[in-house]
């Protein structure tokens, strides 16, 4: 692997708990020994918006700073960054781009070779988890204060499994 990687982070809406948590998770992972070679060059918000992310990435590209990847709090922002990089003639094979949500557009971007990784939030699994908790409560059974449904990593290697889910 690489000895050093410089990345940009595109955050969601700053007042949104999911954006705050996702950004904290990025920071926490980069702080681990396995990822300590990754340096965040800059972190800005796109408010979950594709156009804002495209403008943000265009501004970053105009600085001329070398970078190796973009980590976005959502797929719309990742796609906006991809559009800016393609417009700026960046070789998409030379950068790693990640998002969250496994939207149809994101899966299409992955199939095109532009998006490297996204995360699938299992809505059916979340619904089933909520229903299961409600049924337990109705029966007077104990339920954990928080019920977690694991996210699933989507890569070109397993994308076929997710194309049918969204």
Regions found by a protein language model. Give the residues of each.
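Amphipathic, non-transmembrane alpha-helical scaffold segments
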Residues: 19, 23, 71-74, 120-127
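Hydrophobic alpha-helical
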Residues: 26, 42-108
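Hinge/cleft segment of the Venus flytrap/periplasmic-binding protein
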Residues: 6, 10-18, 28-29, 122-166
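Short, solvent-exposed amphipathic alpha-helices that sit
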Residues: 17-37, 52, 56, 80-84, ...
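Short, hydrophobic secondary-structure boundary micro-motifs
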Residues: 38-41, 94, 118-119, 145-147, ...
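Loop/turn elements at helix/coil->beta-strand transitions in domains of secreted/extracellular proteins
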Residues: 2-6, 33-40, 65-68, 92-95, ...
